[in-house]
Amino acid sequence: MRRVITTLIAAAASAALATSVSCTSTSNQPSQGGRPARTADGKPNFNGVWQALNEANWDLQAHEARAGMVTQKGVYDYEYARVPAAPVVALGAAAGVPASLGVVQGDGQIPYKPEAALTKQQNGENWIDRDPELKCYLPGTPRAMYMPYPFAIVQGTDKIHMTFAFSNAGRVIHLNKVEGPPDDTYMGHSVGHWENDTLVVEVTNFNGKNWFDRAGNFHSDALKLVERYSPISPDAIRYDVTIEDPKTFTKPWTISMPLYRRLEANATVLDYPCIEFSEEFMYGHLRKQQLVKHWEGETMNVDITRKIPPGDRLHEWYRR
């Protein structure tokens, strides 16, 4: 039975990190009592492994469940009867999109300029070719904060370090005065300060090559973020982000969600080498014997019955 969403607005470090970060100390254990633990300097203790538990990485806005990130017209000419596009058929239900009430505050809409709204639509229709996540690019801010993977925080008095499972990404929040980077970046340049118990971070210097989610929501190099990290329980943070980009949006807008501390005794951010995993996707058209039916430029048309032929070097690797 088709389920329809009727509600469109959501209710509302001093040391550098290694590629794999383990936070198994008391900082990753449940806080005692109803108040957040504090560091030696009296600030809320954000040390530990954290993760968002929502569907924002699929689409920031409220949406119904659907058969795939990319769909095409089916036998019946109804929007709800669309079927997965050929490249995602073989993934079955794993390629589906879970429903969500959304995380965009206010009216739940993203205020795109008309030309930017068209680009967003085209992004969604060409997700397989365009989404930076599929190519294991650095996920960018704020997307790294709500991807379905854990991330670790190591908190110091002058710096706060974050490391993310996806793409081995990292970012540093500077709490002391620091010059901006010479070049724009995927993750941006973060400068923070404390307002009572809330960590406020301004993020600038983006290269404009990231998306916010798999639905094609995007930004330009004019993006400016103001993040607010506010403890709401011993092991939860309310994460609010005000997004401003005059090249793309008509006005600032805000997303909001909780982030949760991972409470396993051995909670760890492990290496997720997606760069290696995406090599066939990005460079398969250069193979002498391609694994897909054919390529049109860098766009693959997948033959889901294609098997790696015996004798192929990759075939022998899988037999090990």
State the predicted function of each range.
Residues 2-320:
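PEST-like low-complexity, intrinsically disordered acidic/proline/serine-rich tracts
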